[in-house]
């Protein structure tokens, strides 16, 4: 039996809350980078961060946009006699300023972590009630990014107003330092963060922590994918669980403030290649931050070629900054081993008049899937230009780096990295305006009015397209 869900505006308060421009001038596109938590947790050190940054640079990923190196929890040894945070000298013998300087000298940006609670999630000193001195500590150490968690919050949650003011205290403190610091809330979507986050932050988590599973339910992530207002977010949430929770929230994100679906799990667990190929572009098209959660020293060629797919990254970094919308969703009978099975179509506008389209197969078998211009341009009126024009179809995975080339790059063949897009030399915005072919995939056909876009999508896989007005 099929169940059909069409997008509604039943929870939209955009007219009330809106999506304002960046509150601090940062986050004009979703942030990209690397965070140690998903792979290394508390096993952190100065050497890990600097070696990882060097490897990201060598692989050409820094120049593709992965510039934030984010140090997560477990870096502190407490506070000094003046109440300021102190870095663990065993893990960071040269101090945080040394780490920041090394990263800055190599064109990276430095991120650190704290929690809006008495303690961090791993039990280290938190910043609740200490916002001004801790913000000054981060500024003094030339930090460019703060991930701000939600553990040990002393019960200061339960309404949007309570959570808003708890997180605004750090926002104000960061601004007071005078240093531009990207502010990333990690409050798990508690108290409807997507309604109020854009006024005080550049991104906000909208669910419990991710795990490297495509559909597997977990009792530690108690809310299913339809519960966007989850009272207990938990953790070990699957990719599809988080994606479905995010579906109604795109209307409350945009330039300067982004829904954060959590770090990328490409090469973190045992996802299949098709699952990784679906995970990455779905995060990209809903304009989630693209934060690598893997050990970059153990990337497989197939995973590397996903992280380095410029035509997908260009969707995420599109200057229009509008998250894609889930247009339809069906449950299907061919469920997987966890009893999960559904198919979806997502669509969204891009800056240059193009449109991004995804056909997502969450079922257990490959299946034919299709869509039409009426579905793709779901907000257009009958007879509008979008519905009466012919569109060229570009497959955004068609020019994926092959395993041989990826292996050469991973083996530090500097010549091989020359094929990669370099966003340091030419921004994605400029590359799109100049029609750089690396950002558009490969043309595979056209879609005329009243025609149907047909394709076969693998199990737990995706068909991912950019539509361009036909010449």
Swiss-Prot record:
Keywords, in A-Z order: Disulfide bond, Glycoprotein, Glycosidase, Hydrolase, Secreted, Signal
GO BP term, pick one: melibiose catabolic process
CDD domains the record matches: GH27
Enzyme class name: hydrolase
Pfam family name, one: Melibiase_2
Glycan attachment residues as annotated in the record: 105, 175, 270, 370, 403, 413, 422, 435, 454
Catalytic activity as recorded in UniProt: Hydrolysis of terminal, non-reducing alpha-D-galactose residues in alpha-D-galactosides, including galactose oligosaccharides, galactomannans and galactolipids
Location(s) in or outside the cell: Secreted
EC number(s) per entry: 3.2.1.22
Leader peptide range in chain numbering: 1-18
Cystine crosslinks: 42-74, 121-151, 221-237, 223-230
Gene coding for it: MEL2
Keyword Disulfide bond: yes
Sequence intervals crossing the membrane: none
Residue sites binding substrate per the record: 72-73, 147, 205, 251
Catalytic residues identified in the record: 149 (nucleophile), 209 (proton donor)
PANTHER family, per database record: ALPHA-GALACTOSIDASE MEL1, ALPHA-GALACTOSIDASE/ALPHA-N-ACETYLGALACTOSAMINIDASE
GO molecular function: alpha-galactosidase activity
Subunit structure: Homotetramer.
Cellular component aspect of the GO annotation: extracellular region
UniProt similarity note: Belongs to the glycosyl hydrolase 27 family.
Species in which this protein is naturally found: Saccharomyces cerevisiae
Protein name: Alpha-galactosidase 2
């Amino acid at each position: 039996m099929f169940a059909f869900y069409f997008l509604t505006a039943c929870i939209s308060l955009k007219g009330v809350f809106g999506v304002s421009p960046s509150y601090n001038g940062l986050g004009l596109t979703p942030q990209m980078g690397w965070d140690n938590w998903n792979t290394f947790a508390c096993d952190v050190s100065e050497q890990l961060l600097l070696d990882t940054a060097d490897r990201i640079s060598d692989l050409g990923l820094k120049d593709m946009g992965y510039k934030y190196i984010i140090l997560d929890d477990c870096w502190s040894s407490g506070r000094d006699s003046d109440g300021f945070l102190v870095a663990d000298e065993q893990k960071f013998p040269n101090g945080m300023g040394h780490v920041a300087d090394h990263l800055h000298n190599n064109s990276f940006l430095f991120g650190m972590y704290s929690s809006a609670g008495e303690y961090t999630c791993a039990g280290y000193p938190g910043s609740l009630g200490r916002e001004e001195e801790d913000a000054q500590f981060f500024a003094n150490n030339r930090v460019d990014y703060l991930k701000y968690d939600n553990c040990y919050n002393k019960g200061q949650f339960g309404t949007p107003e309570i959570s808003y003011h708890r997180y605004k205290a750090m926002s104000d403190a960061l601004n007071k330092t005078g240093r531009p610091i990207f502010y990333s809330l990690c409050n798990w979507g508690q108290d409807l963060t997507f309604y109020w986050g854009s006024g005080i932050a550049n991104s906000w988590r909208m669910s419990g922590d991710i795990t490297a599973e495509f559909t597997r339910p977990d009792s530690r992530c108690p809310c299913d994918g339809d519960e966007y207002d989850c009272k207990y977010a938990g953790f070990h949430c699957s990719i599809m669980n988080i994606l479905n929770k995010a579906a109604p929230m795109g209307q409350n994100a945009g330039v300067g403030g982004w829904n954060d679906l959590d770090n990328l799990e490409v090469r973190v667990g045992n996802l299949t290649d098709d699952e990784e190929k679906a995970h990455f572009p779905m995060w990209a098209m809903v304009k989630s931050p693209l934060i690598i959660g893997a050990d970059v020293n153990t990337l497989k060629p197939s995973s590397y070629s996903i992280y380095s797919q410029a035509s997908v990254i260009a969707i995420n970094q599109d200057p229009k900054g509008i998250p894609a919308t889930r247009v339809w969703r069906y449950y299907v009978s061919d469920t997987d081993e966890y009893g999960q099975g559904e198919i979806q179509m997502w669509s969204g506008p891009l800056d240059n008049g193009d449109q991004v389209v995804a056909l997502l197969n969450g079922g257990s078998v490959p299946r034919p899937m299709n869509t039409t211009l009426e579905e793709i341009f779901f907000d257009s009126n009958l007879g509008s230009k979008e519905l009466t024009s012919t569109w060229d179809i570009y497959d955004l995975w068609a020019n994926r780096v092959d395993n041989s080339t990826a292996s050469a790059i991973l083996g530090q063949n500097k010549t091989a990295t020359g094929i990669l897009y370099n966003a340091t030399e030419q921004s994605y915005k400029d590359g799109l305006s100049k029609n750089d072919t690396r950002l558009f995939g490969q043309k595979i056909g056209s879609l005329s009015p009243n025609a149907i876009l047909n394709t076969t999508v693998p199990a737990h896989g995706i068909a991912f397209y950019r539509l361009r007005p036909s010449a």
